[in-house]
Amino acid sequence: ELDELVAPVLALQAYLSETHDEAFLQERFVQDGLSLILARLREARHPDTALYETFLQPTDDEIVHPYLTYDNVLVWRALQLLADWRPAQRGSLLAEADAVRAAIFTHCVKKDADGQPYFAWSVDLAGHHDVYDEPPGSLQLLPYYGFCERTDVIWQNTVRMIRSADYKFSFAGKPIAEIGCPHAPWPWVLSLCNSLLCGHAEQALRELTI
Protein backbone atom coordinates (compact mmCIF):
# COMPACT_ATOMS: atom_id res chain seq x y z
CA GLU A 1 0.00 0.00 0.00
CA LEU A 2 1.70 3.12 -1.26
CA ASP A 3 0.28 5.56 1.28
CA GLU A 4 1.36 3.33 4.17
CA LEU A 5 4.80 2.86 2.62
CA VAL A 6 5.62 6.57 2.74
CA ALA A 7 3.66 7.41 5.91
CA PRO A 8 6.72 6.86 8.17
CA VAL A 9 8.60 9.52 6.21
CA LEU A 10 5.84 12.07 6.81
CA ALA A 11 5.58 11.01 10.45
CA LEU A 12 9.33 11.41 10.89
CA GLN A 13 9.14 14.93 9.52
CA ALA A 14 6.35 15.77 11.98
CA TYR A 15 8.48 14.42 14.83
CA LEU A 16 11.56 16.35 13.76
CA SER A 17 9.56 19.56 13.37
CA GLU A 18 8.36 19.30 16.96
CA THR A 19 11.53 18.02 18.64
CA HIS A 20 14.47 19.08 16.42
CA ASP A 21 15.93 15.71 17.40
CA GLU A 22 18.43 15.45 14.56
CA ALA A 23 20.34 12.71 16.39
CA PHE A 24 17.32 10.44 16.05
CA LEU A 25 17.40 10.92 12.29
CA GLN A 26 20.94 9.52 12.23
CA GLU A 27 20.09 6.38 14.20
CA ARG A 28 21.05 3.30 12.21
CA PHE A 29 17.58 1.76 12.36
CA VAL A 30 16.03 4.99 11.08
CA GLN A 31 18.43 5.21 8.16
CA ASP A 32 17.93 1.51 7.39
CA GLY A 33 14.18 2.07 7.41
CA LEU A 34 14.45 4.99 5.01
CA SER A 35 16.64 2.92 2.70
CA LEU A 36 14.06 0.14 2.73
CA ILE A 37 11.29 2.61 1.87
CA LEU A 38 13.29 3.87 -1.11
CA ALA A 39 13.91 0.31 -2.27
CA ARG A 40 10.21 -0.54 -2.06
CA LEU A 41 9.35 2.67 -3.88
CA ARG A 42 11.59 1.68 -6.77
CA GLU A 43 9.63 -1.55 -7.09
CA ALA A 44 6.34 0.37 -7.34
CA ARG A 45 7.47 2.84 -10.01
CA HIS A 46 6.21 2.60 -13.56
CA PRO A 47 9.20 1.80 -15.81
CA ASP A 48 8.68 4.79 -18.11
CA THR A 49 6.53 7.25 -16.15
CA ALA A 50 7.24 8.75 -12.73
CA LEU A 51 4.07 7.42 -11.14
CA TYR A 52 3.92 4.78 -8.42
CA GLU A 53 1.31 2.06 -8.23
CA THR A 54 -0.63 0.65 -5.31
CA PHE A 55 -2.98 -2.30 -4.89
CA LEU A 56 -5.19 -0.84 -2.16
CA GLN A 57 -6.78 2.55 -1.61
CA PRO A 58 -6.35 4.53 1.65
CA THR A 59 -9.43 2.75 3.06
CA ASP A 60 -7.75 -0.60 2.27
CA ASP A 61 -10.46 -1.24 -0.31
CA GLU A 62 -9.37 -2.53 -3.71
CA ILE A 63 -8.27 -0.04 -6.33
CA VAL A 64 -10.04 0.77 -9.58
CA HIS A 65 -6.86 1.97 -11.31
CA PRO A 66 -3.32 1.48 -9.97
CA TYR A 67 -2.00 5.05 -9.97
CA LEU A 68 -3.70 7.15 -7.29
CA THR A 69 -3.21 10.90 -7.43
CA TYR A 70 -3.29 11.30 -3.64
CA ASP A 71 -0.78 8.50 -3.08
CA ASN A 72 1.60 9.93 -5.66
CA VAL A 73 1.38 13.34 -4.00
CA LEU A 74 2.54 11.62 -0.81
CA VAL A 75 5.42 10.07 -2.76
CA TRP A 76 6.33 13.50 -4.12
CA ARG A 77 6.42 14.94 -0.60
CA ALA A 78 8.34 11.99 0.81
CA LEU A 79 11.01 12.31 -1.90
CA GLN A 80 11.45 15.99 -1.05
CA LEU A 81 11.93 15.17 2.62
CA LEU A 82 14.32 12.32 1.87
CA ALA A 83 16.35 14.69 -0.30
CA ASP A 84 16.77 17.00 2.71
CA TRP A 85 17.93 14.14 4.90
CA ARG A 86 20.26 12.45 2.41
CA PRO A 87 22.72 14.97 0.96
CA ALA A 88 24.49 12.36 -1.16
CA GLN A 89 21.23 11.54 -2.94
CA ARG A 90 19.74 15.01 -2.87
CA GLY A 91 20.04 15.71 -6.58
CA SER A 92 18.52 12.45 -7.75
CA LEU A 93 15.73 12.51 -5.16
CA LEU A 94 14.72 16.07 -6.00
CA ALA A 95 14.80 15.23 -9.71
CA GLU A 96 12.49 12.30 -9.09
CA ALA A 97 10.17 14.44 -6.97
CA ASP A 98 9.96 16.94 -9.82
CA ALA A 99 9.28 14.11 -12.25
CA VAL A 100 6.44 12.79 -10.06
CA ARG A 101 4.89 16.23 -9.86
CA ALA A 102 5.09 16.64 -13.63
CA ALA A 103 3.62 13.17 -14.18
CA ILE A 104 0.67 13.95 -11.92
CA PHE A 105 -0.16 17.08 -13.89
CA THR A 106 0.33 15.23 -17.18
CA HIS A 107 -1.57 12.02 -16.45
CA CYS A 108 -3.84 12.68 -13.45
CA VAL A 109 -5.47 15.92 -14.55
CA LYS A 110 -8.61 15.42 -16.63
CA LYS A 111 -11.35 17.71 -17.98
CA ASP A 112 -15.06 17.70 -17.30
CA ALA A 113 -17.83 18.14 -19.87
CA ASP A 114 -17.28 21.90 -19.80
CA GLY A 115 -13.55 21.56 -20.36
CA GLN A 116 -12.65 22.42 -16.78
CA PRO A 117 -9.60 20.58 -15.38
CA TYR A 118 -9.69 18.50 -12.21
CA PHE A 119 -7.58 15.90 -10.45
CA ALA A 120 -8.70 12.34 -11.13
CA TRP A 121 -8.72 10.00 -8.17
CA SER A 122 -6.83 7.27 -10.04
CA VAL A 123 -5.59 6.49 -13.55
CA ASP A 124 -4.28 3.48 -15.45
CA LEU A 125 -2.07 5.31 -18.01
CA ALA A 126 -4.24 3.82 -20.75
CA GLY A 127 -6.81 6.60 -20.84
CA HIS A 128 -9.05 5.47 -17.99
CA HIS A 129 -9.67 7.29 -14.72
CA ASP A 130 -12.28 7.71 -12.01
CA VAL A 131 -13.83 10.62 -10.13
CA TYR A 132 -13.75 9.66 -6.48
CA ASP A 133 -12.40 10.56 -3.05
CA GLU A 134 -11.81 8.86 0.30
CA PRO A 135 -11.70 10.59 3.69
CA PRO A 136 -8.62 8.60 4.84
CA GLY A 137 -6.66 10.03 1.89
CA SER A 138 -8.48 12.95 0.34
CA LEU A 139 -7.62 15.06 -2.68
CA GLN A 140 -8.76 17.97 -0.52
CA LEU A 141 -5.45 17.67 1.34
CA LEU A 142 -3.18 18.48 -1.62
CA PRO A 143 -2.55 22.09 -0.45
CA TYR A 144 -1.94 20.83 3.09
CA TYR A 145 0.96 18.77 1.76
CA GLY A 146 2.25 21.73 -0.24
CA PHE A 147 1.53 20.21 -3.63
CA CYS A 148 -0.56 23.17 -4.78
CA GLU A 149 -2.13 26.34 -3.46
CA ARG A 150 -5.75 26.62 -2.42
CA THR A 151 -6.06 29.11 -5.26
CA ASP A 152 -5.12 26.42 -7.81
CA VAL A 153 -8.00 26.16 -10.27
CA ILE A 154 -7.54 22.43 -10.82
CA TRP A 155 -7.75 21.74 -7.10
CA GLN A 156 -10.69 24.09 -6.63
CA ASN A 157 -12.60 22.33 -9.42
CA THR A 158 -11.80 18.96 -7.85
CA VAL A 159 -13.07 19.97 -4.42
CA ARG A 160 -16.16 21.52 -5.94
CA MET A 161 -16.95 18.24 -7.74
CA ILE A 162 -16.55 15.93 -4.77
CA ARG A 163 -18.37 18.25 -2.36
CA SER A 164 -21.23 18.81 -4.81
CA ALA A 165 -24.65 17.27 -4.23
CA ASP A 166 -24.18 15.65 -7.65
CA TYR A 167 -21.35 13.50 -6.32
CA LYS A 168 -22.60 10.11 -5.17
CA PHE A 169 -20.85 10.10 -1.80
CA SER A 170 -21.32 13.77 -0.93
CA PHE A 171 -23.66 14.81 1.86
CA ALA A 172 -23.95 18.39 0.62
CA GLY A 173 -27.03 20.08 2.01
CA LYS A 174 -27.23 17.68 4.97
CA PRO A 175 -26.62 18.67 8.61
CA ILE A 176 -23.10 17.25 8.33
CA ALA A 177 -22.18 18.23 4.78
CA GLU A 178 -19.10 16.06 4.42
CA ILE A 179 -17.96 13.18 2.21
CA GLY A 180 -18.29 9.42 2.60
CA CYS A 181 -17.27 6.46 0.45
CA PRO A 182 -18.34 2.81 -0.02
CA HIS A 183 -16.13 1.75 2.89
CA ALA A 184 -18.07 4.09 5.18
CA PRO A 185 -21.16 5.41 3.36
CA TRP A 186 -21.82 8.31 5.69
CA PRO A 187 -20.04 11.57 6.65
CA TRP A 188 -16.85 10.31 8.25
CA VAL A 189 -15.14 12.02 11.16
CA LEU A 190 -12.04 11.84 8.95
CA SER A 191 -13.88 13.98 6.44
CA LEU A 192 -14.43 16.57 9.15
CA CYS A 193 -10.69 16.46 9.83
CA ASN A 194 -10.01 17.07 6.14
CA SER A 195 -12.35 20.05 6.20
CA LEU A 196 -10.46 21.51 9.14
CA LEU A 197 -7.26 21.31 7.09
CA CYS A 198 -8.47 22.30 3.63
CA GLY A 199 -10.25 25.61 4.09
CA HIS A 200 -13.63 24.51 5.40
CA ALA A 201 -12.76 24.81 9.08
CA GLU A 202 -15.66 27.10 9.95
CA GLN A 203 -18.14 24.63 8.50
CA ALA A 204 -16.45 21.66 10.19
CA LEU A 205 -16.40 23.34 13.59
CA ARG A 206 -20.07 24.19 13.23
CA GLU A 207 -20.88 20.58 12.33
CA LEU A 208 -18.96 19.32 15.34
CA THR A 209 -21.36 21.19 17.60
CA ILE A 210 -24.46 19.50 16.15
What are these regions (language model features)?
Residues 1-9, 14-44, 53-58:
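Active-site lining segments of carbohydrate-active enzymes
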Residues 7-24, 74-88, 140-151, 191-207:
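Well-ordered alpha-helical scaffold segments within catalytic/enzyme domains
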Residues 28, 32-39, 43-54, 65-76, ...:
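Extended ligand-binding clefts on enzyme/binding-domain cores
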Residues 177, 205-210:
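C-terminal catalytic domain of Rieske-type non-heme iron oxygenases
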